[in-house]
Amino acid sequence: MQASIQNRIFFGLVVLWSTTVLEPLRAIPRMDLNDYPQPIAGHQRWVIQLPGLLAKSSDPGLSTNAVDWRVQLIVGRTIQLVCNQYHLAGQGLRMERFQGAEQRMLYSVAGAVKVMSTRMVCPPDEPKRESFLVLGSKPYLVPYNASFPIVVDVPDGLEVRWRLWKAEITQREAIKL
């Protein structure tokens, strides 16, 4: 009799634990890429799964509402540099929506990306330095949405990085002309 009550309590706690701990984990789909087309030949797929909750900012002037946040996608390549000026040349990111995938989008770089540089003669004793060259001159911002992964297909040899942009709480008035 005593063992039966202990078993009921144990199984009750297991059910309670599974509904309170495991259920929230199912609330945000994780890395479900079934609806996405395969990357084309010569491209690599990079995936960003945004956290549902972020640590609170120490700056009270920044919005804590995810609707006010953006994710900057940064495509580039790490290379060894000498004294010349370098940049990546090619088409920037583009967004593609596809049928039957709700709010899911695929971001990709089409075409070749080349390293361009000046051709100055560098001092022979100057050491090389490693640097991350970014494709494009303007930030590519996408809405913050932890419900779906951000999927980016880029040509082989490139990598994808990201950073979070948060808006200020304060709104300022524009000047009416």
UniProtKB/Swiss-Prot annotation:
Subcellular location: Periplasm
Cysteine disulfide partners in this protein: C83-C122
Residue numbers marked as site, Reactive bond: R119, M120
Gene Ontology terms for molecular function: serine-type endopeptidase inhibitor activity
Classification via InterPro entries: Ecotin_sf, Prot_inh_ecotin, Prot_inh_ecotin_gammaproteobac
Chief place of localization: periplasm
Protein's job: General inhibitor of family S1 serine proteases.
Protein name as it appears in the record: Ecotin
